[in-house]
Amino acid sequence: MRIQDLILPEDRVFFQLFSKMTTSLHQAAGHLADMTSDLTSAHQKCHAIRQLEHEADGITRDIFERLDESLITPLEPEEIGRLAPALDDVIDAIDWVSHQLCNYGINETNEILQEFSSLIVKCAQQIEEGVGLLATLKKPLEVKEKSIEINQLWNRSRELLSSAILDLFKTQDPVLIIKFKDIYENLEEVLAKCNHVGHVLNDISMHHV
């Protein structure tokens, strides 16, 4: 019998908290996608993302407080200690780039913004499903598959960033070049943070095979 099969009910709270965080992450990604589809609602979406970011910070604090108090945990303490901030970092990165879109006064969207957002939503979905699978760890190879998919999405974002920056330098407006280059790089950074979550998920799943 594995340790996961011996967990007391109260120790399942870590999975409940991780579920809340991945739900918030997925919602934040959805708001970002909505923003890049229609920037007229950008400020409302920024506010919604900021609220989710605050909630995620609170969940992260709760996880670490409970970790300090728990004698038995469903995962290794260091695994919980890696996963919680990794998830929080993704939401922080989404919050940052969403506020860049607002603060830089970007009034018109484009296909590149939308494609980045689509990749982020897809990563958020894989993260939510992958973290959900940790609740039993009966299918560690499925968790690994999620991490592989996340990595593939990140690789696509790196290619998108390269082509997007090349296209940027075809414009004659230096201010727009600076603004969009910064935004594109930070959108790719969101996906890099997602990829880090994927690495953590992979490490956890392989440890429990």
Which positions does each model-derived feature cover?
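Cytosolic, long alpha-helical scaffolding segments
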Residues: 1-209
